[in-house]
Amino acid sequence: RNLKPIASYLLAGSIILLMITKGYYLINGIESPARWLYLGLFSFQTSDIARLSLIIFLAYYLDEIKARIKNLYDGFLPPVTAIGILMAFIVIQPDFSTAFMVGLIGILLLFISGARIFHILTSFFAGLLISFPVIYFSPYRWARIRSFFNPDIKSDGYQAYQAELSMSNGGWFGSGLGNSTEKNHLLPTPHTDFIFSIIGEELGFLLGTLPLLLVFLFIFFRGIKIAKRCTDPFGIFLAMGICINIVLYAFVNAAVATGLFPVTGLPMPLISYGGSGMFINMVMIGILLNISQAKRSINNSKTWSSLSFG
């Protein structure tokens, strides 16, 4: 409830942070992707903050307008515009994968809220049309798409090939903790983008990757159950947005590691190394737990324990 009054300010603040991040890199002539904002000894990825802010804003907005979401101009168009603006500022960092995920999460929330299918499909295909030149005229993005359909293991397809090789090395039961060969300068970014491959190599399918995916499915279905029990529409949309976000990121990361998706650079939630991403995901889990205990604490305030959730 404390998030509702500041939802719009959080979204506006996130857009400002994205602008500051890009401006900082341009002013200082830094050629690397403008994804991190540095404050002394600390740094954080501003798109992570934007992702959470958008979920909170959409939950607030959908709660406020309710059935008007079926109207185009005073219902559906404002949140789609907010999603588009946020995606645009993330794309120019450049971080197309995160922008795509932000858009997908937003569209799914609009679908859950009861928006017209025609409006949703129109927005989705419009996004695809805009995305094509963004991908095609970016050499490294187009190389990732091209290598997915025609992999060159010595060039653009090297990462994907090594990730699949790592998974195959693990087999059913893995090579043992710490025994991965791929993480020793063979597979790029094994601690972030391809952590799922290393888990598969060291712990195997039965002890590593399958249990991990089941944990994320548990979080997803638990989040849906929390949303169904919640009596506040804001809490319902917030819980749904959070569990959709977590499970989408998890399964896209796993799909990249197994060769089902092109390389995206998206981390595995709660697993991949990274301060700001880990912090934001923990905040999301905390909000989900808060929504879960709210109804119980009201109905049974004398016996409620902070250790009991759901």
Give residue spans per PLM region:
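Interfacial segments of multi-pass membrane proteins
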Residues: 62, 103-119, 181-207, 266-279
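Hydrophobic, glycine- and aromatic-enriched re-entrant/interface helices and adjoining loop segments
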Residues: 30-36, 119-211, 230-235
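Membrane-proximal intracellular helices of multi-pass ion channels
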Residues: 139, 213, 220-235, 300-309
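Loop-to-helix entry and N-terminal half of a specific, functionally important transmembrane alpha helix
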Residues: 226-265, 271
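Membrane-helix boundary/helix-loop-helix interface segments in multi-pass membrane proteins
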Residues: 1-93, 254-269, 273, 277-278, ...
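Hydrophobic alpha-helical segments of polytopic membrane proteins
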Residues: 8-15, 73-91, 96-136
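Alpha-helical transmembrane segments of polytopic integral membrane proteins
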Residues: 55, 59-62, 139-142, 217-220, ...
